A protein has these predicted regions:
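C-terminal ends and interior cores of transmembrane alpha-helices
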Residues: 8-35, 237-257
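Cytoplasmic helix-loop-helix junction between adjacent transmembrane helices
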Residues: 45-86
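Loop-to-transmembrane helix entry/capping segments in MFS-fold secondary transporters
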Residues: 70-82, 193, 290-302
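Symmetry-related core transmembrane helices of the 12-TM Major Facilitator Superfamily/SLC fold
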Residues: 108-126, 328-346
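Juxtamembrane intracellular "pre-TM" segments in multi-pass secondary transporters
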Residues: 128-164, 183-188, 219
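Short amphipathic helix-loop junctions that connect adjacent transmembrane helices
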Residues: 171-196
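Transmembrane alpha-helices of Major Facilitator/SLC transporters
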Residues: 196-223, 238, 242
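C-terminal transmembrane helical hairpin of 12-TM major facilitator-type secondary transporters
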Residues: 228-279
Length: 354
């Protein structure tokens, strides 16, 4: 239906999701506090919020394909800036959310965000140029799945790459940090939650900044697609090495809790730097390989793989932590990274032959 529609739909769904969460207490009262209904209500609202985010992200990145020329590294620079700034804003959002919760409370914070998004949506309706892409109303559902081998291999690599990140980020790292920073008392719990939230937001901001400057770090204007794929392959292998070292250090149990905490923090920053470069390269490659006529479907398929990877990582994060703690999470992340690395080989071979 075109990028304008998907962008508006993304913002609209986000407004609906936030409004639903803001009304949670009233809905909970009307359902007589039924736990199963309450859980389903929150899960559906959060799911709608996730769909909204991906629609908005897909629209923005697809528009870059249409607007930026793929010459002299221009496309790479534009998509890296968009991706990096998006994640920097996401990290800032953690801090803003914490501040809103502290000063005006949960419900008022959500209604404030709803009002802000309504203003943004109305502005976009009036200032957005129409027809960023052609509307292919005859497209079949099966056409969503890409027939481009480059995109299929890249999407597979993306699935395991983000699975490798979330398998230790979702459960392992927050619980490990909490166990080090809190003694279990109410005051220490609050302090620990704030410290962990601040650290993760700071990490995401730096992660986004690294993504934005990746073209400059790699001198992208002078590099071919094949060269960029080779760098991607080396970067994901380096990620696996970082994770393997962290796995060995945590499993050996030779360090004190405090010393291990600092090792993990250093490892997080090293992992984040390389992961940001790799993610930025992926974001460029998906647009470079997409056909202009079906860019929304190609990018949508790619982000479907991204979402599947995050689901896989979240599931494995809980399971692996349950059975083996942080070392098991890190070991699982290492394996997923290696899978991502292996899937880059066919992509490199295809590009070399082409």
């Amino acid at each position: 239906l075109g990028l304008n529609f998907t962008l508006y739909a993304g913002l609209g769904f986000q407004i609906i999701a936030l409004s639903a969460l803001a009304l949670y207490s009233e809905v909970l009262q009307s359902s007589a506090g039924l736990a199963s209904f309450s859980l389903a209500y929150v899960v559906i609202s959060q799911g709608l919020s996730g769909i909204a985010k991906d629609l908005t992200k897909m629209s923005a990145k697809s528009a870059v394909k249409w607007l930026a020329p793929d010459s002299d590294g221009t496309l790479f620079r534009w998509v890296a800036f968009l991706t990096g700034s998006k994640n920097a804003v996401k990290g800032s959002g953690f801090l803003l959310g914490a501040a809103l919760l502290t000063f005006i409370g949960f419900t008022s914070a959500l209604w404030s965000l709803v009002a802000l998004l309504l203003v943004v949506l109305l502005l976009l309706v009036f200032i957005m140029p129409s027809g960023l892409t052609t509307k292919n109303k005859s497209a079949k559902l099966k056409q969503v799945f890409s027939v481009n081998s480059h995109i299929n291999w890249l999407s597979g690599a993306r699935l395991f790459l983000f699975g490798a990140r979330d398998v230790w980020f979702v459960v392992g790292i927050p619980i490990f940090f909490y166990s080090i920073l809190s003694d279990g008392s109410l005051s220490q719990n609050r302090t620990a939650f704030f410290q962990i939230g601040f650290f993760m937001s700071f990490w995401i901001i730096l992660y986004g900044a690294t993504q934005a400057i990746t073209p400059k770090l790699l001198n992208s204007a002078s590099r071919s697609r094949y060269s960029i794929i080779r760098i991607t392959k080396m970067a994901v292998l380096f990620l696996a090495v970082i994770l393997a070292v962290l796995t060995a250090v945590t499993a050996a149990n030779l360090l004190s809790d405090r010393a291990l905490f600092y090792v993990i923090v250093i490892g997080l920053f090293g992992f984040g730097f390389v992961f940001a470069i790799n993610s930025s390269l992926h974001s460029y490659l998906i647009l470079a390989f997409s056909d202009a006529e079906r860019v929304t479907m190609d990018v949508g398929f790619y982000y479907m793989s991204n979402a599947a990877g995050r689901l896989l990582g979240t599931f494995l994060s809980g399971v692996s932590y349950q059975f083996g703690g942080l070392p098991a999470c890190l070991a699982c992340a290492t394996i997923l990274c290696l899978f991502s690395w292996l899937l880059i080989f066919p992509l490199a071979n295809l590009q070399k032959q082409g």
